[in-house]
């Protein structure tokens, strides 16, 4: 515990930091600047905080997002006054949309130096609009004990709001008067003699912040689900802190209902395939056969989290409008299709635990939940089981599950055979090869645009326990490299799959190389432009397509890597790539560039993605 009694600002900032560390903070990302000096000094000198200096604010924010996403705990992000904080904005949007806890601390000038052209001053109050979970401006630092208590409790509340009821960013605007440096001030001597640190911080522990009570559970119609003979589970993109428990819970639900499970590639489910015998990975390709898609129409869909990326799947659901139940504990609206939907504000793990408990107690799974009751012993809302005699369960139709299983088997075999025999450097094969070649448990960050879609199309199920990571909150390409480095920092050796434009958009992330602890291999699909635009109608209009949409940059990545002292290799064959991935290094950053033909790859997709279904199951 360290309270810096040199002056008013050092006392204030060190109490702020000490409060955060007692709540559980371990990492702070600090951008250089003058006005944030008290915060930087406090974080940098605290023995329990890993303080990481990063030059570029946008890169810093995405790196912090990556660290927070991996750990599940808030990361502090500090900058000086002026436009510095504006560069955090893209990562704050992503943090809100993808539910990542961040604590944004923007230093500011005091009120008397605003709106008077005092320099490096903008309006930072509510700088990030409605994206933070909570935001406030702290008082100007003071030595009065009541104000120090106010600071402590405000920081506790900020920590809580970054985590509950739904994780996301919190913004504290922090004004400081001069002197900003830790210049000694005799005025703090009296406070130092009276300050009882252990008493002041006695109640500040991780246990002092409790989750908010869960939102009241809706009626969970388990009996209705079990009675349905054309039910389906769709598991969308997910980055759970405990991927195995997440996959086990979904497996329990799927097998207890005998529902096929459509599993997004940006989910750990495909990498714990042994847990889920009803897993369907080729749904996008299956649904391209419109006659077969009609035969597979469900009457009921249980959606776990957000929908998968697939446009084919979304269009199919939108066309047939089945009743949908969305299982997710967050308070967001997760129905982008505006269908016949009921949100169930509960985690899939809670439902999986309920199923396990009933099996353990030899009760019939399927008894279902009914209206909520409050357990008066702990005031936690609990589901109540419907009595066995009240159940009405009709026999399930095994043919619906078999139709999906047969289609999956046929198309999976066709995709795997096609990919295995493909000699050319087609960018989609990179995603398939990663599913076959990465060491078990490898953290894999997947960039937006075509990489996420290639993973959904081609990623083959297995038991590798690979954990996919991504920025699909706002779906932008900004911060790709920096986020991946944040995921990989002090983690198992990691891999990133990215296109050339996404990497170029964040090359300042390479400046992290001298502070980065761990290893990241970057699989760079270089098709010299935006490959995803080749899949859109605008690609037929030339000009302006190539110059203004594909935007080729003609970059020599070997020279770029040399500038940043990053290892580089050009990939000439799939066998070479497999060898380089079989055992990942433990330190540093390396780029493995796969040169591809953007237009040839787009033509291949247009020709082949709809041709894998040869016969109906």
How would you describe each model-predicted region?
Residues 2-8, 316-365, 379, 383-452, ...:
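Phosphate/pyrophosphate-binding active-site segments
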Residues 87, 220-223, 235-325, 333, ...:
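Glycine-rich, anion-gripping cofactor-binding loops and their flanking helix/strand elements
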Residues 13-17, 21-24, 34-35, 39-40, ...:
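Active-site diphosphate/adenylate-binding microenvironment
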Residues 106-158, 263-362, 390, 394-407, ...:
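Glycine-rich, acidic loop regions that bind phosphate or pyrophosphate groups
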Residues 5-94:
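N-terminal cofactor/phosphate-binding cores enriched in small/glycine residues
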Residues 105, 112-126, 432, 459-616:
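Thiamine diphosphate
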Residues 26-29, 50-52, 70-109, 297-305, ...:
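A short, small-residue-rich loop immediately preceding and capping a beta-strand
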Residues 166-169, 173-214, 581-617:
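Glycine/aspartate-rich loop-and-adjacent alpha/beta segment that forms the canonical ThDP
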């Amino acid at each position: 515990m360290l309270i810096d009694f040199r002056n008013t600002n050092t006392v204030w900032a060190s109490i702020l930091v000490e409060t955060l560390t007692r709540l559980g903070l371990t990492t702070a990302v600090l951008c250089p600047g003058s006005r944030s000096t008290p915060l930087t000094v406090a974080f940098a000198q605290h023995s329990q905080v890993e303080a990481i200096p990063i030059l570029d604010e946008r890169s810093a924010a995405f790196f912090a997002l990556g660290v927070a996403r991996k750990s599940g705990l808030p990361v502090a992000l500090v900058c000086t006054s002026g436009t510095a904080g504006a560069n955090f904005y893209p990562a704050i949007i992503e943090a809100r949309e993808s539910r990542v806890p961040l604590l944004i601390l923007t230093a500011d000038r005091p009120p008397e130096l605003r709106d008077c052209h005092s320099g490096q001053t903008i309006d930072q109050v509510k700088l990030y609009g409605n994206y933070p979970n909570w935001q406030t401006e702290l008082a100007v630092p003071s030595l009065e004990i009541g104000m120090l208590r106010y600071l402590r409790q405000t920081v506790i509340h900020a920590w809580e709001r970054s985590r509950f009821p739904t994780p996301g960013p919190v913004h504290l605007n922090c004004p400081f008067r001069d002197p900003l440096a830790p210049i000694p001030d005799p005025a703090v001597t009296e406070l130092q003699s009276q300050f009882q640190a252990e008493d002041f911080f006695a109640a500040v522990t991780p246990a002092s912040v409790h989750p908010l009570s869960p939102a009241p559970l809706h009626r969970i119609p388990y009996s209705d689900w079990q009675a349905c003979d054309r039910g389906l589970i769709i598991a969308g993109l997910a980055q759970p802190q405990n991927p195995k428990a997440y996959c086990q819970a979904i497996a329990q639900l799927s097998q207890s209902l005998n529902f096929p499970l459509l599993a997004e590639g940006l989910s750990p489910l495909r990498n714990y395939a042994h847990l889920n015998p009803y897993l369907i990975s080729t749904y996008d390709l299956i649904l391209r056969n419109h006659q077969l898609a009609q035969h597979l129409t469900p009457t009921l869909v249980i959606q776990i989290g957000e929908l998968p990326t697939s446009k084919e799947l979304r269009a199919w659901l939108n066309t047939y409008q089945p009743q949908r139940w969305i299982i997710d504990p967050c308070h967001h609206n997760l129905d982008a299709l505006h269908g016949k939907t009921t949100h169930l504000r509960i985690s899939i793990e809670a439902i999986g635990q309920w199923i396990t408990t009933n099996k353990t107690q030899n009760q019939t799974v399927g008894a279902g939940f009914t209206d909520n009751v409050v357990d008066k012993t702990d005031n936690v809302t609990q589901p109540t089981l419907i009595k066995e005699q009240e159940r009405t369960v009709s026999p399930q139709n095994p043919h619906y599950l078999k139709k999906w299983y047969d289609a999956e088997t046929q198309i999976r075999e066709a995709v795997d055979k096609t990919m295995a025999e493909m000699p050319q450097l087609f960018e989609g094969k990179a995603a398939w090869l990663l599913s076959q070649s990465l060491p078990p448990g490898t953290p894999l960050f997947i960039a937006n645009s075509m990489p996420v879609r290639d993973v959904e199309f081609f990623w083959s199920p297995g038991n590798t326990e690979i954990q996919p990571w991504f920025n699909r909150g706002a779906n932008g390409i900004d911060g790709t490299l920096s986020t991946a480095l944040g995921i990989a920092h002090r983690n198992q050796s990691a891999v990133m799959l990215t296109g050339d434009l996404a990497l170029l958009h964040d090359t300042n992330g390479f400046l992290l190389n001298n502070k980065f602890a761990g290893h990241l291999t970057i699989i760079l699909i270089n098709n010299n432009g935006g490959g995803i635009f080749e899949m859109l109608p605008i690609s037929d209009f030339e000009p302006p397509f190539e110059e203004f949409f594909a935007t080729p940059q003609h970059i020599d990545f070997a020279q770029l890597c040399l500038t940043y002292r990053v290892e580089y290799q050009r990939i000439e064959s799939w066998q070479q790539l497999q060898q380089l991935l079989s055992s990942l290094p433990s330190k540093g950053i390396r780029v493995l560039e796969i040169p591809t033909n953007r237009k040839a790859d787009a033509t291949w997709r247009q020709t082949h993605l709809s041709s894998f279904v040869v016969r109906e199951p």
